[in-house]
Amino acid sequence: MPRPAPARSRLFVVACACLVAASPIARAQAPGPPAAQTEWRGVGRVIAFADVHGAYDEMVTLLREAGVLGAQDRWAGGRAHVVSLGDLLDRGADSRKVMDLLMRLQSEAQSAGGALHVVLGNHEAMNVLGDLRYVDPGEYAAYVDLEPPGLRERLRAAWEKANGPGSGSAFDQKFTPGYFGHRVALAPDGRYGRWLLGLPVAVVVDDTLFMHAGPSAVLRGMSLADLNTRYRTALVEYARQYSQLEQAGLLQPGDAFAARPQLATERLAARSAGGQASPEFEAAVKGFTDADAHPLLNPDGPNWYRGAALCNEVAEGDVLAPLLEQFKVARVVVGHTPTRNLRAVTRFDGRVVKLDAGMNKAVYKGRGAALTIEGPKLSVRYSGEAQATVPAPEGLYVAPNSVADAAVTAALTAGTVSVTGPRGPAELDVVIEHEGRRIPGVFQQRSAGDARKEVAAFKLDRHLGLGVVPATVVREVQGQRGVVQARPAKWVSQADVQKQSLRAGGWC
């Protein structure tokens, strides 16, 4: 049975709950209205860019070169429609400036007869919901002016009272200057949170669907309006349920995002053990757990799903094709997944365009990329390059981590094999070391004939361009004949799924 929290911990929980509940962080949510329209036909010229991640200067440079910004960085796009694919936030210090500019440009574009559409990315949703794993310290610092007067001091005093004299430095490290201003501004009823919650998760312009990550089977049967309404409802419901638990002290500022359901459950159990539980608390924890598990907010959701960006085209085509037909479009343009060559590429015979070329140079070493669509013609303009180019096909198979198969098979053949443990009947987990590279893999005991079949399956897979079978060579390990396959640490086969009754992930 869980034990009640120590008195000092309970004191800080109560103090935080009272202070935060009295602040704008946990007021009753009043998000902005949803986008009135999410589909436009007959536009003619569309420009799109992806994943700014706080790189304000790079974004401005790109939009100037693409003709979207003119004198004094005002709207110069005329009647064109411009689409941001989201992920404005995190990893870069200037995300507040990015939002300020795009909010202004939306109004200016409308006045000029054009439009600026901002599609919600997973990092916007994460910030609104308090998942702050990727917030750059400079992003917090940009919100110092929005911290409620006295809130930091009161919370710091409560922390020190709960944790003892001298513990304030730990508070300062956990909640850096601007943290509470950031939470106020990006809360569902905050200046930026209201704007973000009013953004669509997907838009259609002419014959193109624009979405941050990609469409999955979860979207089957939904209209574009349904998708946007359901996604926004899921975000608002999560925020509402979280607010209730925070005010009740069952969740606290700074709790790890992924641990929230477990923490709320454990704290509820501790209260029950102390005779302080109530049906209202139990219902609140249940409601929050359900909101956290909503399929649109999880790996199959439109802000996370990478199937169209990464999965085998033969298998994923059965997912993609009916969804494009469902939304009555010829293609989908996505960000979220940086391309390996940091250039815009196409997949599925042009039905998917991957546009995340790593605009934030400090993090991704890439460049801004602006895709222009005019009828059937697609071209990409990169920052600092004078000429636009046509996005090239990525190809059916791309070697993992950009390591060529020849290099992998050479390492598997000549490298030193170390056994790390048993994997299953006649199988061992191994590590292959070769020329400074460590490759995780699996050794499978096989007869000479079966080993040749395994290698033949690998070669046929590559000949067909599928990329399903891992690199495979014939080897002896611990005196046993068989094959060694290179496999990522968390790789599982369909046989593993069946044997262990595993729950499959959201994409390949």
Regions found by a protein language model. Name each.
Residues 27-396:
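Feature recognizes metal-dependent phosphohydrolase scaffolds
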Residues 13-23:
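Bacterial N-terminal signal peptides
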Residues 1-13:
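Bacterial N-terminal signal peptides that target proteins for export
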Residues 395-407:
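Juxta-kinase regulatory segment immediately upstream of eukaryotic protein kinase catalytic domains
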Residues 5-7, 24, 472:
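Intrinsically disordered, low-complexity regions enriched in serine, threonine, proline
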Residues 406-507:
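Conserved ATP-binding subdomain of kinase catalytic cores across diverse folds
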Residues 212, 402, 413-415:
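FAD-dinucleotide binding site
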Residues 2, 190-194, 360-363, 413-423:
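Short linear motifs in intrinsically disordered
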